């Protein structure tokens, strides 16, 4: 389940591994842990929301958070959304391709496969020379090296959209 080719030493192969059961057992343990936590005293409330992190959810009051846990993507050519989308399908969160597309579109751009024609996150950091100069250097080097593939032409845009998306996200979460 990846674009890379890799091989394991055949002696270490697990034939007919029941990976779904192993994964399900871990999920069940996490659920049991959460149930156990509910029995503890002095537990603070928490809220988990599925939203585009660049758009502050309207149902969260300003200054109502003590902590924000986030796991931002890192710009590279590993499409981390594949795992998210696979998990969502396995858990029956989504049943239609459109839902998967909307999930992917709602994530901060971190690789060339996550850029959409209507993305404008990069516009939010065009005044920051530290970032735009890096994107410009990447694009200039691509041209110097004669790289012409579609994804290579998008590398510099990933930098702009990633940092623009992170800027929007952090500004929204600061509210």
Show the residue positions of the predicted features:
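Nucleic-acid modification enzymes, centered on SAM-dependent nucleic-acid methyltransferases
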Residues: 1-138
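Acceptor-substrate binding/catalytic loop of class I
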Residues: 153-164
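A short glycine-rich, Lys/Arg-flanked "PGG" loop and its adjoining helix->strand segment in the class I
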Residues: 91, 163-175
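Short glycine/proline-rich turn/loop motifs
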Residues: 141-155
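Generic recognition of flexible, low-complexity loop/linker segments
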Residues: 54-58, 158, 171-173
């Amino acid at each position: 389940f990846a674009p890379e080719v890799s091989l394991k030493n055949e002696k270490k192969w697990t034939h007919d591994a029941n990976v779904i059961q192993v994964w399900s057992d871990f999920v069940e343990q996490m659920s049991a842990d959460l149930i156990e936590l509910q029995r503890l005293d002095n537990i603070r409330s928490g809220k988990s929301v599925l939203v585009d992190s660049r758009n502050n959810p309207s149902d969260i009051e300003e200054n109502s958070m003590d902590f924000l846990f986030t796991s931002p993507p890192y710009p590279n050519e590993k499409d981390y959304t594949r795992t998210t989308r696979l998990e969502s399908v396995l858990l029956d969160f989504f049943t239609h391709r459109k839902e998967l597309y909307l999930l992917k579109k709602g994530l901060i751009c971190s690789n060339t496969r996550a850029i959409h024609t209507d993305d404008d996150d990069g516009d939010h950091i065009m005044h920051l020379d530290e970032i735009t100069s890096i994107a410009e250097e990447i694009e200039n080097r691509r041209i110097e090296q004669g790289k012409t593939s579609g994804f290579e032409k998008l590398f510099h845009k990933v930098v702009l959209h990633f940092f623009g998306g992170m800027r929007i996200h952090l500004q929204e979460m600061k509210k």
